[in-house]
Curated annotation (Swiss-Prot):
Descriptive protein name: Glutamyl-tRNA(Gln) amidotransferase subunit A
Active site: 77 (charge relay system), 152 (charge relay system), 176 (acyl-ester intermediate)
Task performed by this protein: Allows the formation of correctly charged Gln-tRNA(Gln) through the transamidation of misacylated Glu-tRNA(Gln) in organisms which lack glutaminyl-tRNA synthetase. The reaction takes place in the presence of glutamine and ATP through an activated gamma-phospho-Glu-tRNA(Gln).
Recorded family membership: Belongs to the amidase family. GatA subfamily.
Subunit architecture: Heterotrimer of A, B and C subunits.
Gene: gatA
Record lineage: Bacteria, Bacillati, Bacillota, Bacilli, Lactobacillales
ATP-binding listed as a keyword: yes
GO molecular function terms noted in the UniProt entry: ATP binding; glutaminyl-tRNA synthase (glutamine-hydrolyzing) activity
E.C. number: 6.3.5.7
One Gene Ontology cellular component annotation held by this UniProt entry: glutamyl-tRNA(Gln) amidotransferase complex
Enzyme class, spelled out: ligase
InterPro entries: Amidase, Amidase_CS, Amidase_dom, AS_sf, GatA
Length: 488
């Protein structure tokens, strides 16, 4: 029996009433995963035995009636450390790495008796927008297997969209949760920078990275964010702000709420079908009582250029630790220590990772630091100021999550600039450290279109309020791809 069409609340009710056990739910989820895995390719590792053992332990001590996540399985992106489960970051460099510790976010999952059922495929070290840079495999879009699932959290998104799991964790450095959520027609939240601990997340861009939830519905997304949020002394960038219940405002009306629609978000480069879908979604929010007004974010057009200097510079520094000496892949082709360093990194990293390391090293090098990295930091400040000006008068910002729907597999691999531009609407949110969500807002030629809602720092509850109001009065989130049993 499959339970993938049941909400988390419904599953919790079944578990509390002992209509099913955590073990039965886990086994059913594993059946769903294996039945769809060949078609979608969402996972690098499926931890059958460990997941069933965890479920049996939960059954033995009993389901906690006050903990809605007790006994619920989920997938975790493969750049988030999981003790005893291979964690590869989809790289040859870490093809056999089994961590001896859990990321803080994973510790919080276990503290709520959740079950990590496997590790989701991704772009190597989270560098990519299509999940095609993975060393292990390519993942297919749940709606059309000839399309990409987006990236870098493509496996996490495809697993939810295809009905393999109800929930997953991703990470978002420049759109890596929101863009694949849009491409696969699910809900994906990039929380405020510092909301979720980064301890145990393999660092890419340390000033940009955030772990976040991916789900079928807005409420489930909020429920999972409530679990993983909170201060962590092991992460100096972790916020000390008290974490409440992110579902608190779900169900409240949005009458009178002021929402800004930046003209740049519907300008050049945005596909006509996407543009029309977002305009329709904005009008729907107006019918629900929101006030939608056009604004300008004039420096957002520089976001991609700023991002690829800042993120690549941080990646260049963060990836220095992978040298063939301490852990991970080591070349067999060496005569001296220099050979170990050079050949290990040449053989262990893929082309996209090496491209970004070189770009970052160049940006930080003597004679170029001021012209590139320092200048990028100055423009980043202007992007932040643009958002602050808008949020002085508006509650939220809306727009498309991505400029297009999912593109063909292998279509942009030889055009990195075009691939980078796919994140033009999500990158500024990371540069400013803001929360942003993608929710299903419609379809263009049979492929999902996501609407992005952006708020001031620590406004996740308000974002969920508006997202849930839209979801409750539309049926886009209920439509499913054929692999999940839908008609599309």
């Amino acid at each position: 029996m499959s339970f993938n069409n049941q909400s988390i609340d419904q599953l919790h009710d079944f578990l509390v009433k002992k209509e099913i056990s955590a073990t039965e739910l886990t086994k059913a989820t594993l059946e769903d995963i294996h039945a769809r895995e060949q078609a979608v390719g969402s996972f690098i590792t499926i931890s059958d035995e460990m997941a069933i053992a965890q479920a049996k332990e939960i059954d033995d001590k009993g389901i906690d009636a006050d903990n809605v996540m007790s006994g619920i399985p989920l997938a975790v992106k493969d750049n988030i450390s999981t003790k005893g489960i291979l964690t590869t970051a989809a790289s040859k460099m870490l093809y056999n790495y089994e961590p001896i510790f859990d990321a803080t976010a994973v510790e919080k999952l276990y503290a709520k008796d959740m079950i990590v059922i496997g590790k989701a495929n991704m772009d190597e070290f989270a560098m990519g927008g299509s999940t095609e840079t993975s060393y292990f495999k390519k993942t297919n879009n749940a709606w059309d297997h000839s399309k990409v699932p987006g990236g870098s959290s493509g496996g996490s998104a495809a697993a939810v969209a295809s009905g393999q799991v109800r929930l997953s964790l991703g990470s978002d450095t420049g759109g890596s949760i929101r863009q694949p959520a849009s491409f696969n027609g699910i809900v994906g939240m990039k929380p405020t920078y510092g909301r979720v601990s980064r301890f145990g997340l393999f660092a890419f861009g340390s000033s940009l990275d955030q772990i976040g939830p991916m789900s079928q519905t807005v409420k489930e997304n909020a429920q999972l964010l409530t679990v993983i949020s909170g201060h962590d002394v092991r992460d100096s960038t972790s916020s000390e702000r008290t974490v409440g219940d992110f579902t608190a405002k779900i169900g409240q009306d949005i009458q009178g709420m002021k929402i800004a629609l930046p003209k740049e978000y519907l300008g050049e480069g945005i596909a006509q079908g996407v543009k029309e879908t977002i305009i329709k979604a904005a009008k729907h929010l107006e019918k629900l009582g929101a006030v939608i007004e056009e604004v300008s974010l004039p420096h957002s057009k520089y976001g991609v250029a700023v991002y690829y200097i800042v993120a690549s510079s941080e990646a260049s520094s963060n990836l220095q630790r992978f040298d063939g000496i301490r852990y991970g892949y080591r070349t067999e082709n060496y005569k001296n220590l220099d050979d170990i360093y050079v050949n290990t990194r040449s053989e262990g990293f893929g082309d996209e990772v090496k491209r970004r390391i070189m770009l970052g090293t160049f940006s930080l090098s003597s004679g170029y630091y001021d012209a590139y990295y320092k200048k990028a930091g100055q423009v980043r400040s202007l992007i932040i100021q643009d958002f602050e000006k808008v949020f002085a008068d508006y509650d939220l910002i809306l727009g498309p999550t991505a400029p297009t729907t999912a593109f063909d597999l292998d279509s942009l691999n030889h055009d990195p600039v075009a691939m980078y531009l796919a994140d033009i609407l999500t990158i500024p949110v990371n540069l400013a450290g803001l929360p942003g969500i993608s929710i299903p807002a419609g379809f263009d030629q049979g492929l999902p279109v996501g609407m992005q809602l952006i708020g001031p720092k620590f406004s996740e509850e308000t974002i969920y309020q508006v997202a849930a109001a839209f979801e409750a009065t539309t049926d886009y989130h209920k439509q499913q791809p054929k692999i999940f049993g839908g008609e599309n």
